[in-house]
């Protein structure tokens, strides 16, 4: 074939994309290829199979080849078996086949191939050469045109779906990209097309505009309040969008929690120590299904479990709660208001439900509703509620652990149980408390917390904290406290994990703000790392907890919870710790916690003792007892109780919450009294429950939603916090405030507000705070509101020291815990940072982080610290390491409930799981 024709063939082969089109380019050729051209063509076929197909196509389009040329063609093949196959195809074109020595030399190695080669060549020599000799090759063809009937690329296209080319069209693809080659020619642009003017109309000048819509999860360019990232916070509880739709909420939450649960289970088991294990397992078990939730919920649990062992309890709680109670809870949760009521109603008995409002707090007390609320984490909460009964049972299991309490709770009333559940770890206790309110609660709580194996772990974690470790103690309020605290702490420890609960809450229910809180909570928890569990509880309560994290911030936490009272509680409890107490039983826990927690966590404070007493006092006592503790709680209603350091709070809380009995409620207010504002808050939380509520209301006002917050922690909280932001937030913010805020965006709001003593409870806010502070130096911060307390906190440092130890201990384990711890402490402290300055400084406490925004926090933290905290706790994070930075920073945006945003940071720990 002449060179020009061969180039045309090669061009057709190059254009073809698929082997079958390349083969068609050969098959359509009119003409004969020389051996050298065959070797060139084979280079365009990648490996043996396509090469052999090409050989088959070339078999009848070749001029006769001599043995030496056959060798060069066969050398294009790598393996002798392919060479043999090619030889069989070439056989009829070989001239002088008798002289086959060079060909046979290619098959020296394998005897069977050598024999086959000989046989093929013998047949070829007998048959003779069928191929034309070189000079005849061009007969009947038009030189330079191997495709008289048209090029294959024109007839068939070069790729399936390619339009066929028309004559006259430029057929070359030179300079075209792969897209142009595959798509084929395109119409020329219209004459009016101006590539430099994309649209035919004038483009208006660009005005400044937001490119990302502000939402609960981000602050799109919004100016941070008080230099906190407040704006978005209160992310609504994403997961449980329907306040009313408990079921749905339940579901969403549930699933999350559930997952969490699953996750948690192990933790529970881990903690099996408390008797919980069973329950926990159950809890976990049931839930397990949901993995994510698990993360959320469980994380806390899990974490908790992990961290504390508490977790189990928590977990169980959480888990259960989650699933079940949704209904009430959700409501509660969803709606701040409702929650309270619903809670109540749900558990009617439990008016406690009111506590529900507290949700965080309440839950413990009681109310299941509350719990639900707190959980908020709606989910949890709701679970709680819904589950209330179930939960109770569940609780019972927990309770089992909780043992009496639990049982009591459970028996007492599902509600309680739910409550418990709400608290998850804590919850348990609470619930009992709630229902039992009276003692059981404590018992429950205690038991839950402590008792449970969880407790144990928890305890152990709390240990110092709980000390009361013994169930008994635990039972006692201390336990609860411890539990809570511990729980919380634990939770926090796990923090992340807890987080998860919180998170769960958080995640599940960002609303609770928990997420943030969660984080916070965790942190709060962290505060009590030991507490982790509590956290878990908290977590459940998560929202609260989160506050918890702040714990010191508890208030804040509360705020966070705020709505999340429960959470708050937790938080508080963790932070205020007392908070729980507020819850009454919880409160106790909390109460104690506050101080204790930090210390406790760190051992130092035994506050738990108080809590214990509180616990007992549960309601009354609680309230009373807690005052101090309360203080922290005070922060939010729940908080309140927690503040309770606010004591009053506590009381009210207790009353309201704990006391489900309303009586308490009333007291609550009084209790708060000191923190009047809190009181209000309290009320609000209690709100749900009772007269106290009134105060709450008032508080609420400030909190605004405190109630709501309580009610819905998330929302309210957020709201409250946020809205109140100034006031409210302040309240929470106080310590938590920041923390909270950070935890919860919502909180955040408050944070800014933080300024006031209790932003959240603006009323009390500062004043309260102050008193509070005094109450517990360490705790007080929370009470105080971040601001003032902080400083105090600073003084509190004592806790810090404690923390530090803890921290260090936890640190390795859970950064988060650490953080939390710090947070706790801090939270406790409010600034926390201050408090534990040594500790992590934790300014970073997540909750705190926001706090800083609070001025108080800042002050507390020294602005800088605060900021860093604000920043994220990051510091703490650093301290924490893993937690690192973000960690709780995100909390601000709980983001979605499920999300692990808040976790994110902590992620490291619980991991997204």
Curated annotation (Swiss-Prot):
UniProt KW keywords: Acetylation
Post-translational modification remark: Glycosylated. Interaction with OGT leads to GlcNAcylation.
Modified positions (N-acetylmethionine) in chain numbering: 1
Ranges of compositional bias, category Low complexity: 276-291
Polar residues bias (residue ranges): 251-275, 488-506, 893-913
Top-level lineage group: Eukaryota
InterPro entries, sorted: DUF4476, PROSER1
Region annotation (Disordered) ranges: 233-291, 488-507, 592-618, 888-913
The protein's role, per its UniProt record: Mediates OGT interaction with and O-GlcNAcylation of TET2 to control TET2 stabilization at enhancers and CpG islands (CGIs).
Summary of subunit composition and partner proteins: Interacts with TET2 and OGT; this interaction mediates TET2 O-GlcNAcylation and stability by promoting the interaction between OGT and TET2. Interacts with KDM6A. Interacts with TET1.
Stated name of the protein: Proline and serine-rich protein 1
Organism: Mus musculus
């Amino acid at each position: 074939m002449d060179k020009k024709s061969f180039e045309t063939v090669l061009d057709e082969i190059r254009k073809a994309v698929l082997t079958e089109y390349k083969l068609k380019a050969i098959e359509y050729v009119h003409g004969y290829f020389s051996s050298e051209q065959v070797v060139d063509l084979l280079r365009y076929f990648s490996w043996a199979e396509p090469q052999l197909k090409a050989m088959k196509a070339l078999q009848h389009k070749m001029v006769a080849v001599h043995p030496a040329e056959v060798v060069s063609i066969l050398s294009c093949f790598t393996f002798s078996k392919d060479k043999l196959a090619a030889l069989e195809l070439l056989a009829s074109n070989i001239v002088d086949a008798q002289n086959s020595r060079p060909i046979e030399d290619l098959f020296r190695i394998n005897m069977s191939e050598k024999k086959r080669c000989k046989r093929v060549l013998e047949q070829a020599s007998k048959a003779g050469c069928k191929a034309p000799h070189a000079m005849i090759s061009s007969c009947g063809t038009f030189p330079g045109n191997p495709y008289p009937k048209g090029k294959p690329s024109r007839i068939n296209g070069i790729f399936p779906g390619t339009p066929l080319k028309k004559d006259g069209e430029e057929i070359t693809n030179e300079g075209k990209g792969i897209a142009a080659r595959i798509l084929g020619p395109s119409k020329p642009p219209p004459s009016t097309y101006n590539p430099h003017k994309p649209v035919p109309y004038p483009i208006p000048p660009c005005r400044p505009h937001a490119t990302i819509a502000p939402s609960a999860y981000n602050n799109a360019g919004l100016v941070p309040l008080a230099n906190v990232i407040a704006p978005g916070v209160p992310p609504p509880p994403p997961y449980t969008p329907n306040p009313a739709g408990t079921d749905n909420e339940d579901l969403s939450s549930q699933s999350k929690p559930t997952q969490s649960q699953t996750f948690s289970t192990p933790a529970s088991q881990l903690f099996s120590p408390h008797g919980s294990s069973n329950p926990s397992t159950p809890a976990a078990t049931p839930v397990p299904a949901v993995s994510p939730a698990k993360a959320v919920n469980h994380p806390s649990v899990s974490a908790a479990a992990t961290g504390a062992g508490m977790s189990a309890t928590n977990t169980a709680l959480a888990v259960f709660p989650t699933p079940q109670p949704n209904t009430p809870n959700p409501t509660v949760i969803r709606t701040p208001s409702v929650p309270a009521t619903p809670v109540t109603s749900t558990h009617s008995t439990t008016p406690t439900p009111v506590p529900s409002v507290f949700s965080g707090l309440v839950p413990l007390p009681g109310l299941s509703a509350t719990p639900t609320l707190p959980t908020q984490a709606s989910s949890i909460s709701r679970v709680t509620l819904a589950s209330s009964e179930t939960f109770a049972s569940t609780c019972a299991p927990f309770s089992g652990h909780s043992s009496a309490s639990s049982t009591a709770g459970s028996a007492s009333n599902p509600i309680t149980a739910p409550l418990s559940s709400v608290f998850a770890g804590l919850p348990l206790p609470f619930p009992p408390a709630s229902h039992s309110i009276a003692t059981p609660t404590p018992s429950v709580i205690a038991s839950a917390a402590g008792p449970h194996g969880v407790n144990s772990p928890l305890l152990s974690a709390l240990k110092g904290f709980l000390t009361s470790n013994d169930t008994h103690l635990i039972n006692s309020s201390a336990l609860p406290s411890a539990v809570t605290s511990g729980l919380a702490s634990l939770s926090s420890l796990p923090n992340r994990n807890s987080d998860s609960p919180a998170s769960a809450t958080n995640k599940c229910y960002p609303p609770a703000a928990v997420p943030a809180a969660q984080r916070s909570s965790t942190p709060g928890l962290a505060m009590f790392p030991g507490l982790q569990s509590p956290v878990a509880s908290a977590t459940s309560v998560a929202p609260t907890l989160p506050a918890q994290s702040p714990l010191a911030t508890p208030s804040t936490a509360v705020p966070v919870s705020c709505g999340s009272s429960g959470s708050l509680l937790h938080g508080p409890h963790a932070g205020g710790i007392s908070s729980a107490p507020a819850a009454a039983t919880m409160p106790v826990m909390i109460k104690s916690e506050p101080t204790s927690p930090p210390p406790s966590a760190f051992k130092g404070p035994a506050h738990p003792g108080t809590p214990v007493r509180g616990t007992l006092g549960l309601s009354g006592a609680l309230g009373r007892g807690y005052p101090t503790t309360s203080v922290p709680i005070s922060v939010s209603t729940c908080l309140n109780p927690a503040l309770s350091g606010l004591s009053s709070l506590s009381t009210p809380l207790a009353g309201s919450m704990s006391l489900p009995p309303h009586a308490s409620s009333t007291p609550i207010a009084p209790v708060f009294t000191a923190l009047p504002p809190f009181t209000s808050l309290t009320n609000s939380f209690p709100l749900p429950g009772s007269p106290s509520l009134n105060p709450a209301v008032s508080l609420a006002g400030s909190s605004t939603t405190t109630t709501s917050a309580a009610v819905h922690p998330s929302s309210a909280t957020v709201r409250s916090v946020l809205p109140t932001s100034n006031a409210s937030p302040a309240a929470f913010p106080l310590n938590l405030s920041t923390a909270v805020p950070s935890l919860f965006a919502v909180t955040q709001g408050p944070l800014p507000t933080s300024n006031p003593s209790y932003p959240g409870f603006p009323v009390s806010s500062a004043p309260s705070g102050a008193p509070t502070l005094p109450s517990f130096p360490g705790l007080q911060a929370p009470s105080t509101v971040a601001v003032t307390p902080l400083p105090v906190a600073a003084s509190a440092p004592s806790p810090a020291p404690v923390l530090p130890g803890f921290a260090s201990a936890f640190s390795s384990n859970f950064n988060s815990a650490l953080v939390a711890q710090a947070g706790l402490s801090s939270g406790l402290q409010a600034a926390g940072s201050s408090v534990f300055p040594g500790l992590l400084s934790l300014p970073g406490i997540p909750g705190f982080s926001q706090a800083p925004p609070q001025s108080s926090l800042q002050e507390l933290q020294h602005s800088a610290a605060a900021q860093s905290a604000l920043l994220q706790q990051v510091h703490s994070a650093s301290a924490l390491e893993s937690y690192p930075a973000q960690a709780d920073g995100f909390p601000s945006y709980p983001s979605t409930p499920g999300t692990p945003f808040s976790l994110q940071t902590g992620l490291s720990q619980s991991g997204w799981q």
